[in-house]
């Protein structure tokens, strides 16, 4: 039986029996040809030359003056309690006893998740002489609320403290040779008819709002401090290039733009490796993907363990209305194990009573290990330059606290 076979480089191979030919036209199927990307450039530079040009153009490329940044900040945490044991418990407060503590530990969740989202205007300057400022627009949070049993135990402990501990007492906490002062709040009831009591409550509320705002500034500052051109950045691939090896530069596509792609790995004690994406026209780093390849921090001493084993993420820099690049997006993942295995004493003292100042004492040994993972994300919707005078006139005053939600189901920044 005779066959006729047709084969060509962009045609699907086809075969026919000669006896089946009954037409002068033979239909063949074309096969798509996959071609690799081809980049043509007149800049044949080594990675060392590219890095050198990045350094040379830092001041020209990146915004270091006063800016107003319209931001969305998200921070999600997962905490797993690997071990939590309290023994050798002694207490001079009758209601605070070992059985109550055992009930408390038995009802504590082994895993807790939380989330906090904030929309704000964040004001900054590269110069550390000027404190960063924030105007919070709104904020929301979610976390595991206590169960009924745990809430009941906490209420019982709170009542016992209010009954036995005096509002004008001061407190010391000791762990072996270590010691310090301890503030215990909430022992005073707020009397709505007492002007002084109300004033203290209002001052406390203002402080909480101020502390929340400062906490958000601290989180955002930490992200900006990772920018590769910041003085104390841990991502010092560019400021200290002698500490790193750089791969041969590849041409790649990022979004719709051509970029140089360079891999960076540490030579010695440096802890981070990274992928750098560099604009070939102005030699600006427009994206960094980084990851730690060694523990960021690890200590085990005198019953205290801290092991920061994870820090990775990415940072994207973009041009907004001006001609310079600013941070437009960042995500940093963080993981650490913390352990504490030491004796603790909580001592109540009061100088307004006759006799000895020591009133009550609670002592125990705590053995605790937790694993905490957090993911912090910032999206900058807009960034614009402002004058030093405008920056100085901005008041650091916050009236916003996060609203609680059982879960986040909506797009928080849609109307922003």
Predicted feature descriptions by range:
Residues 9-11, 21, 31-33, 43-45, ...:
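Solvent-exposed coil/turn segments that connect beta secondary-structure elements
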Residues 3-5, 39, 263:
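Residue-level detector of beta-strand face positions
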Residues 238-243:
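Short, surface-exposed beta-strand/turn modules with glycine/proline-rich turns
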Residues 247-299, 305-319:
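Feature captures eukaryotic membrane-trafficking machinery centered on endolysosomal pathways
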Residues 14, 23-231, 237, 255, ...:
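Surface-exposed, low-complexity/disordered segments
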Residues 2-16:
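A short, solvent-exposed loop/turn motif at the edges and junctions
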């Amino acid at each position: 039986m005779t066959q006729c076979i047709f084969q060509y480089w962009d045609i699907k191979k086809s075969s026919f029996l000669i006896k089946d030919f009954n037409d002068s036209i033979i239909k063949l199927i074309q096969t798509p040809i996959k071609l690799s990307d081809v980049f043509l450039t007149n800049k044949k530079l080594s990675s060392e030359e590219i890095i050198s040009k990045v350094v040379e153009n830092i001041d020209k490329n990146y915004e270091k003056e006063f800016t107003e940044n319209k931001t969305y900040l998200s921070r999600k945490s997962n905490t797993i309690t690997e071990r939590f044991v309290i023994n050798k418990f002694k207490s001079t407060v009758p209601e605070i006893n070992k059985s109550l503590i055992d009930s408390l530990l038995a009802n504590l969740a082994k895993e807790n998740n939380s989330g906090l989202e904030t929309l704000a205007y964040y004001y900054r300057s590269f110069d550390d002489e000027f404190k960063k400022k924030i105007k919070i627009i709104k904020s929301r949070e979610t976390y595991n609320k206590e169960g009924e049993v745990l809430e009941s135990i906490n209420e019982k402990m709170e009542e016992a403290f209010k009954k036995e501990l005096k509002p004008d007492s001061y407190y010391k906490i000791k762990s072996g040779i270590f010691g310090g002062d301890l503030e215990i709040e909430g022992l005073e009831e707020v009397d709505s008819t007492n002007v002084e009591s109300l004033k203290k409550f209002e001052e406390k509320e203002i402080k909480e709002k101020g502390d929340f705002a400062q906490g958000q500034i601290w989180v955002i500052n930490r992200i900006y401090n990772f920018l590769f051109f910041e003085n104390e950045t841990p991502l010092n691939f560019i400021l200290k290039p002698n500490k790193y090896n750089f791969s041969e530069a590849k041409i790649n596509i990022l979004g719709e733009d051509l970029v140089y792609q360079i891999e960076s790995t540490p030579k010695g004690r440096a802890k981070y490796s990274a992928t750098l994406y560099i604009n070939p026209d102005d030699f600006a780093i427009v994206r960094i993907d980084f990851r730690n390849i060694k523990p960021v921090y690890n200590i085990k001493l005198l019953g205290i363990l801290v092991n920061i084993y994870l820090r990775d993420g990415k940072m994207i820099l973009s041009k907004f209305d001006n001609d310079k690049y600013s941070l437009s997006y960042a995500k940093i993942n963080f993981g650490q194990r913390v352990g504490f295995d030491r004796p603790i004493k909580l001592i109540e003292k009061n100088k307004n009573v006759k006799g000895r100042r020591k009133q009550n004492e609670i002592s125990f040994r705590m053995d605790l290990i937790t694993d905490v993972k957090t993911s912090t994300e910032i999206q900058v919707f807009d960034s614009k330059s402002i004058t030093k005078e405008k920056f100085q006139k901005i008041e650091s005053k916050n009236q916003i606290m996060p609203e609680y939600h059982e879960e986040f189901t909506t797009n928080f920044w849609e109307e922003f």
